[in-house]
Amino acid sequence: MSIAFIGAGNLATNLAKALYRKGFRIVQVYSRTKESAQGLAQTVEAAYTTELQAVTKEAQLYIVSLKDAAFVELLPQIVSGKENALWVHTAGSIPMNIWQGHVARYGVLYPMQTFSKQREVDFGQIPCFVESNSEEDVQLLKDIASALSEKVYEASSEQRKSLHLAAVFTCNFTNHMYVLAAELLKKYGLPFEAMLPLIDETARKVHELEPLAAQTGPAVR
């Protein structure tokens, strides 16, 4: 299957690399910046472009991984002339029906994880949630996701919205607390590394205990 990526950010970079390693053919990468487009394209042996009108019309699957606002704004331009291919986005918070009226075949491929370009992740353990407007494409997306991960689920847009919100609490807000802790420690000349055993144990606990049962310290009170 030939795949084109619209976007070359943190998620797109990790997903494209994972698909490439599993033998999928990435034919092109689009990003508005040459550095991002070319960097990812070279890694997965693909062409690249920084112009939406130059995005290939020959791919069988288009994976859109852009910031939410940019995706909504650029959607008509992105799909122009390529309406008969399968289109998916990777966002947790955007409903599947955003595609409706723009393309015939569409869906969502949502790997629920925190991604950074500079850090490789083990896709085998990442939960992947799929959705499509046809049963045939649901199965196709499940097959693609299953090539990467042992944990593949079908989830509706409403379910995925809740997953995304839960992930924000679990990851983004938690990491922001680390930022605040690091700033406090720095102010008093203490290393953030002193927090790492505490961070690790806190994370390990919820593998064995319900989050409420694992809560200790001032937060209990």
Task: Locate each region found by the language model.
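Internal alpha-helical scaffold of NAD(P)-dependent oxidoreductase catalytic cores
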Residues: 36, 40-43, 120-165, 170-207
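Rossmann-like NAD(P)(H) cofactor-binding subdomain of soluble oxidoreductases
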Residues: 34, 44-120
